[in-house]
C-alpha cells in the first residue's frame, strides 16, 4: 500500500508556513512604517534653521522615537508623536494644493502652524516647544529636498508680548517681516531675516509658495531672540 505520509507532511508544512509568512509580512510592514525615512518618497522641504516644530521633533527623536525620555524631556514632541507619528516622519510634506495665493483667507486663526491640516493639529498647540536661539538678525536656512524652487517666501513673527506657551498663532498676533523674490530650483536656500527689535520667546511663521505647481507650505519655528 502506497504511503501518503509525505503528502500529509507537505500540507502540514504549508499550513504552518502560511500564518508564519503573514505574521512576518505584517511585522515588516509595521517596522517600515515606523522608520524615519518612510515618508521620504513624498520629498518636498522645510525650514531647517531655525527648525520647524515637526523638523525639530524628527531631528531630535527620529532615531530614538521609542525612548521614554521623550515624554519628559520634550513633551510637545511626545504629544505630537502620540497624536500622529506621521507628523514627525513627514516633516517635509506639510502642504496644501490649489490655494492660488489665498493662503491667509483660507487658513483659520489657530491653525497656522499645521497649515490647516487636521492630521497635524498637534503642531498648533501652545506649550514648551524647543526653541532655537537666534540674534536680532539671522540667516534662515531652508532645505528644498525635491528642488521645487520658490515663487516666494513670506516670513512673519509674533508680536512682542505673545506667549508661545499659552497662545496659538493667529493672523492677529503676527507681523510680516520679510518677503523674498523667486528662487531657482535648488536644495539649499538661505536669506537674512531681521526680527525688527523683538526679543525673547517668539514664533517664526514661514510661508513657502513652491514654483513647480500651486503648492503652499506653512510652518512654525520657535525661537528665542537674544
Task: Give residue ranges: language-model regions.
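Secretory targeting and sorting signals
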Residues: 2-43
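Short loop/turn segments at connectors of secondary-structure elements within structured domains
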Residues: 37, 149-151, 198-202, 217
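N-terminal "mature-chain" segments and other terminal, solvent-exposed stretches
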Residues: 44-148, 152-168
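Intrinsic-disorder/low-complexity, polar/charged segments enriched in Ser/Thr/Lys/Arg/Asp/Glu/Gln
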Residues: 135-139, 188-190, 218
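Internal, hydrophobic beta-strand segments that form the core of beta-sheet-rich folds
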Residues: 158, 198-213
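A short, structured loop/turn motif at beta-sheet edges
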Residues: 161-162, 195-200, 226
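Extracellular carbohydrate recognition and processing domains
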Residues: 167-194
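Extracytoplasmic/periplasmic copper-protein system
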Residues: 218-226
Amino acid at each position: 500500500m502506497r504511503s501518503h505520509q509525505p503528502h500529509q507532511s507537505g500540507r502540514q508544512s504549508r499550513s504552518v508556513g502560511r500564518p508564519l509568512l503573514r505574521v512576518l509580512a505584517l511585522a515588516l510592514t509595521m517596522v517600515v512604517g515606523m522608520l524615519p525615512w518612510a515618508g521620504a518618497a513624498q520629498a518636498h522641504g522645510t525650514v531647517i534653521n531655525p527648525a520647524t516644530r515637526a523638523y525639530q521633533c524628527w531631528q531630535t527623536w527620529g532615531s530614538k522615537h521609542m525612548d521614554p525620555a521623550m515624554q519628559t524631556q520634550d513633551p510637545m514632541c511626545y504629544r505630537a508623536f502620540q497624536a500622529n507619528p506621521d507628523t514627525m516622519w513627514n516633516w517635509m510634506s506639510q502642504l496644501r494644493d490649489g490655494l492660488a495665493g489665498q493662503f491667509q483667507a483660507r487658513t483659520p486663526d489657530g491653525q497656522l502652524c499645521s497649515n490647516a491640516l487636521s492630521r497635524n493639529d498637534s503642531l498648533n498647540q501652545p506649550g514648551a516647544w524647543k526653541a532655537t536661539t537666534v540674534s536680532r538678525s539671522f540667516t534662515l536656512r531652508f532645505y528644498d529636498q525635491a528642488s521645487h524652487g520658490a515663487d516666494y517666501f513670506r516670513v512673519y513673527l509674533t508680536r512682542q508680548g505673545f506667549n508661545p506657551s499659552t497662545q496659538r498663532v493667529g493672523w492677529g498676533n503676527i507681523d510680516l517681516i520679510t518677503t523674498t523674490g523667486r528662487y531657482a530650483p535648488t536644495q539649499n536656500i538661505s536669506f537674512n531675516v531681521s526680527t525688527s527689535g523683538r526679543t525673547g520667546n517668539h514664533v517664526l511663521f514661514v510661508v513657502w509658495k513652491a514654483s513647480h505647481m500651486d503648492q503652499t507650505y506653512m510652518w512654525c519655528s520657535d525661537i528665542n531672540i537674544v
